[in-house]
Amino acid sequence: MILIKNAQIVNSIDNKLEKADILIVDDKIEKIGKNIEENPDKMIIIDTSGKYVMPSFTDIHCHLREPGFEYKEDIKSGSRAALAGGFTTICCMPNTNPPVDNRAMIAYIKYRAKEVSPIEVLPVGAITKGLSGEELAEIGFIKEEGAIAISDDGKCVMNANIMRNALLYSKDFSIPVISHCEDTNLSEGGQINLGYVSTITGLRGIPREAESIIVARDILLAKETKAHLHITHVSTKESVRLIKMAKEWGVNVTADTCPHYISLTEEEVLGFNTNAKVNPPLRTQEDIEALIEGLKEGVIDCISTDHAPHHKDEKNVEFNLAASGTIGFETAFSVLFTYLVEKNGFDIGKIVELLNYNPRKIIGLSPNIIKEGEKANLVIVDLKKKWEVKEENIVSKSKNSVFLGKLLTSYVETVIYNGKILKKDGVLSC
């Protein structure tokens, strides 16, 4: 048994704070109430005075690199990094080697996750065979085997007819399509956002229209097919406007953005910082403001990390040779608290909604809720703690965080999943 004393409970649905004790028996929340009797001989007692207890988080977009790229990350190391950040459900993208484009690969991911992961790992299947963009994968079999979505993430499905057919099949099989929106005719060879910083650094720029053109295309295709389109890692103000318009039309479209897009601008690239090379690229302050407004209004539904680990040798090279991507599991909550709550007045309940209720709804899962009879999946956070992101403290196998050296507020101290304490006072037990 676990007894959490003096909890300030935040549930994303009603957005109300409740001060109470929480008794966990086996894998469920047995009781929530005032002054629950302590029994130190039979209980693990955790005093959370001054801290907050909230449902654990879900990430619908990450890269675990297994199979094929285990030198960057693997299912076990990535799951531990996710756990360190408060995530107990993560959805891994199919751009592995070989790609997750058939039922056997879906089965492999599920088997490996069950074998080595302390948390829930859900596979995303490919839209096209080999992520080639040329021939649809066997979407029905992929769904039947347990994929929670389909995506060619890392690549855009450039053929509009292929994308249209994918949406039609996805509707029949009730599976969302996660779209990586990037017109490669515009972005090819680009390194960073096209603008002031690309001009002064001499790095080739990627026009913002590379994203918004495909966002517009896919919205129109979703409107026609009536399929569930999810637009991932939104980074521009134009994309926000297009998604808002689509929702006003009644299109079945959802969207996410990432912590780095709501906090950092293209100026992070100055000095040729390869950890700031991400895809889509970091944009401008105007884009940040539009994304934050989109989150406030519900135009952008949730936050994903797009956790993209790369070996140091793939980052410690000339900028135009460096791999794109940043790790994100371990900093996500703290970045959101620092940049949305502290700097933009968001309610803490809204953050829980962005990391729990909404992402789970998008992939068809019930939310994690702190309620009697529900599974004990929760995190304890210290909202006052300030910490610097340092390479030596990163759990992920790769250390390529765009937030290295940044000072963040709030810290995920303890994580309980299915009634088991997997992280306590900042230390993982798995």
From Swiss-Prot:
Zn(2+) 2 binds at D153, H180, H233. The keyword Hydrolase applies. Keywords: Hydrolase, Metal-binding, Pyrimidine biosynthesis, Zinc. Disulfide bonds: none annotated. The active site is at D306. Signal peptide: none annotated. GO terms for biological process: 'de novo' UMP biosynthetic process; purine nucleobase catabolic process. It is an enzyme of class 3 (hydrolase). It holds the Pfam family Amidohydro_1. One of its GO terms (molecular function) is zinc ion binding. Its EC number is 3.5.2.3. Pathway: Pyrimidine metabolism; UMP biosynthesis via de novo pathway; (S)-dihydroorotate from bicarbonate: step 3/3. Binds 2 Zn(2+) ions per subunit. GO terms for cellular component: cytoplasm. InterPro entries: Amidohydro-rel, DHOase, DHOase/Allantoinase_Hydrolase, Dihydroorotase_CS, Metal-dep_hydrolase_composite, Metal_Hydrolase. CDD domains: DHOase_IIa (cd01317). Substrate binds at H63, L64, R65, N95, N279, H310. Catalyzes the reversible cyclization of carbamoyl aspartate to dihydroorotate. PANTHER family: ALLANTOINASE (PTHR43668:SF2). Belongs to the metallo-dependent hydrolases superfamily. DHOase family. Class I DHOase subfamily. This is Dihydroorotase.
